[in-house]
Amino acid sequence: MINFLNDIRNAENPISNNRKLINTIAILFLGIALGTFSKYLDFRQAELPSVLMAINGVLDIGNFLGRFAIWILIALCISIYSNSAIRASINVFVFFVGMVASYYLYSNYIAGFFPRSYALIWFGFTAVSPLLAFVCWYAKGKSKLAFILSALILAVLFNMCFVYGCWYFNAKSVLEVIVFIIGLIVLRRDTLRSSALMGTISIVLAFLFNIIIPFHLG
């Protein structure tokens, strides 16, 4: 199994334990900061500083942060730029623990309500995030399987960023368009041709997923 996984992608040059700890703590605090900011933006919309209120009014950042796409992109970046698949699992799990905990602690103790059904979805997603991160880390490998993984990840991201049917196609917001473009850049292959092929296959897969499972996460 180890040889099979190494054929997909090898671990990067090892880093010191101190560096690993610093990176993981930084990712934890990033999650805490983003979770707190997301809930603050949602709860204090009428009391935001004028500049932030104007930006939020144009881009609807509050609702954007309430959907899945941006968090999947951040987790993807943390995963594939981690030193190894195991480190990807740890870092992504720590990020979601920080983000989800800070968001719902703010919601419960400052905003004064606790949306149990949504919280359970995020708790469940956090629980499985190490496994997903482990798999996603291999998407930046050089093998055909890595190529397929990249296309599958982009297909899922596509369906989180766009809504479409027989006679319509819309982006959820301009920010989601940016998220998908960044996803393409992050998962790009060695050549433009391969990257274009990956993007095309991912869109075809997204349409197939939409037919088989016509349910989009946030």
Feature-to-residue mapping (PLM):
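Hydrophobic cores of alpha-helical transmembrane segments in multi-pass inner/ER membrane proteins
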Residues: 69-79, 125-137, 177-183
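Membrane-water interface at the C-terminal end of transmembrane alpha helices
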Residues: 131-144, 184-198, 207-210
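Juxtamembrane boundary at the C-terminal end of a transmembrane helix
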Residues: 206-218
